[in-house]
């Protein structure tokens, strides 16, 4: 595009922004309508309307896609490692769950600290630290032969690295969009589907032939290439804030933010249960039982169909609002989890996997869109998102080990854990309803 034409286009976009802001995502406060009391005085005068498209915006979205691919995509592949580690290490499923749960916990827990650093203008440093930690974790895991070694490498080191990478995938991408914010975040979060399909397929093909060590190294090479691209290409749009607290406690004075955070705590207690346990369930409970390879196919399907849930949910979230869609989605997830109790044949297992994959993908994608909707101050958006991640981290740390402990206590029967997680979804839905009722439009 010629320079003059590009300038005219930008000018038109800015002139029309105030009119367009009225039709933004329902239930969200338009960025341009924020008063000086709601936006930091240090940066308010420098913030221009989100471009809602363009090269930099979509490049940032692609970077967010790669970040989710190498963080949540790898985490969502843990089901295949859960199965392998249970056999290889001869440990109970609840013990193995701690490896994945610690990784997920740290991915969320460090969010509050990372969010403030991003707001302060240190995006490149945050991305570099995250990349280094993830690569150290994956390559040291490839050399691990003991349970405690995998806890340190795949659990702690990869988890810390993920924590540096997950928050910017949401907070930075969201600043480039207004009307299409939910769609852009949805495209970014679809990276977790890409990663799950890629890493599950790699592990499925390489574990029997190349062995565990080279399987992990091959995954590490893919992560290195894509994460280095992100470190170079991803840029923040907003000027750095010159001041601010590490934790914005004022956020919890907003009832909608507080109720949303509590609700997603209960939802995240339950949402990964299906991702971790559908494979062992298919080998232990249904009749006839599935083979190891067939059970891994369920994981591929579970993650693959998630792309439909993510894209459809975020497309309509821009029309109806993320909270409005999140409420029925979490309620349907509760019904799906309770219905899992009745799954007792391979056909039922495949049907349930497709259905839950779509619903679970929708929840994981609408969640960050919902946070962005509730965050009214652009200068502290990273901190608000990070704090939410930190609270939810404790749910992800304990959810699957609790489920594993219930299964072990019931001599390998799953219905107790399924009922517990279905109930957790119901409680979470109730708090999201409360958040919607208290949301200030």
Swiss-Prot record:
InterPro entries: MFS, MFS_trans_sf, Proton-linked_MCT
Glycosylation sites: 388
Membrane topology: Multi-pass membrane protein
Transmembrane intervals: 61-81, 95-115, 125-145, 150-170, 183-203, 212-232, 259-279, 289-309, 323-343, 351-371, 389-409, 415-435
Highest taxon of source: Eukaryota
Annotated Gene3D superfamilies: MFS general substrate transporter like domains
MF GO annotations: transmembrane transporter activity
Keyword annotations of the record: Glycoprotein, Membrane, Transmembrane, Transmembrane helix, Transport
S-S bonds: none
Disordered, as annotated region: 1-47
Induction: Highly expressed under trichothecene-producing conditions.
Subcellular location: Membrane
Recorded GO CC terms: membrane
SUPFAM superfamilies membership: MFS general substrate transporter
Keyword NADP: no
Primary subcellular site in the record, as a coarse category: membrane
Function: MFS-type transporter; part of the gene cluster that mediates the biosynthesis of butenolide, a mycotoxin that shows antibiotic activity but does not seem to play a major role in the spread of head blight in wheat.
Family: Belongs to the major facilitator superfamily. Monocarboxylate porter (TC 2.A.1.13) family.
Protein name: MFS-type transporter
Organism: Gibberella zeae (strain ATCC MYA-4620 / CBS 123657 / FGSC 9075 / NRRL 31084 / PH-1)
